[in-house]
């Protein structure tokens, strides 16, 4: 037997030994996976049972509170606060357990589990989401500038509007996945992206004509301003969130948003004038489109629908921001009054 063949035989025996070890490791892995699945089912069942009983207990306490004494009312208030805190704990627990997708994710992805089981995977996905927002914001800014000042063609406008539709659709999917994994983004700042997706889709279907050309430059200028503000928000919110996480004041899955939240009060209030300017520009867009919808040459249904959509965006953004600012000012006033 030649020396080269002997080396091949030795290598084969080494690989055979490693293969046996791999098989044993894989057997243990499957066993642990089955144990993990059983534990996940047990935890999910126990959490559902606890939540159901706590809900019943909360209703009972609310009924009893009407006829309670002062001491009993204090005890009921304490128990109610404990129940609320327990519900927050369950929310954190469920972030690490498989769960059924909501209606939107079921429509888009089907019944596929999107739960990321490790903190490392959650943070990696969250960081990738933030980078996606940053890169697309820059691309949309460049696209809006190009369409406004260089490329005066309907086809390039359609490409830009299609990019907006794809961007907002992707954001809604990624945000839904992050919410399933424990991110606390909620309320209007989630709905905002669904409304923006619809608005971009209507803009995409708006045929070229006199009315479209009357609104085109205003919309592109608004898109440029909006992208600049979103870039500023991302840049400064990211730094603010990093500091607050280091102090233990924010969750590691908190996201940058295209608006104003209470945690931004320290260090990011300088963004408020830009945000309010953007909100009122949305109102200006709505008013302009309402006026254009009454133009004798206007035959497109998109004009009136876009006017309503911009009005909804203005009301949602403006009232939500105003609510946050008012609540924070009220809280600060109460603090200064305390001795």
Swiss-Prot record:
Q: Which UniProt keywords apply?
A: Coiled coil, Membrane, Nucleus, Transmembrane, Transmembrane helix
What membrane topology term does the record carry?
Answer: Multi-pass membrane protein
| Disulfide bond positions | none
Top-rank taxon of the source lineage equals: Eukaryota
Instruction: Tell me where it mainly resides.
Output: nucleus
Q: Which residues cross the membrane?
A: 102-124, 132-152, 159-179, 187-207, 270-290, 302-322
- Pfam families the record matches: TMEM120A-B
Annotated GO biological process: fat cell differentiation; protein heterooligomerization
Q: Where in the cell is it found?
A: Nucleus inner membrane
Tissue localization of expression is: Expressed in inguinal and subcutaneous white adipose tissue and in brown adipose tissue.
Q: Coiled-coil stretches, from where to where?
A: 1-67
User: What induces the gene encoding this protein?
Assistant: Up-regulated during adipocyte differentiation.
A Gene Ontology cellular component where this protein is annotated is: nuclear inner membrane
Cited function = Necessary for efficient adipogenesis. Does not show ion channel activity.
Q: Which family does it belong to?
A: Belongs to the TMEM120 family.
> Could you give the subunit structure recorded for this chain?
Heterooligomer with TMEM120A.
For this entry, the protein name equals: Transmembrane protein 120B
Identify the taxonomic lineage of the organism of origin.
Eukaryota, Metazoa, Chordata, Craniata, Vertebrata
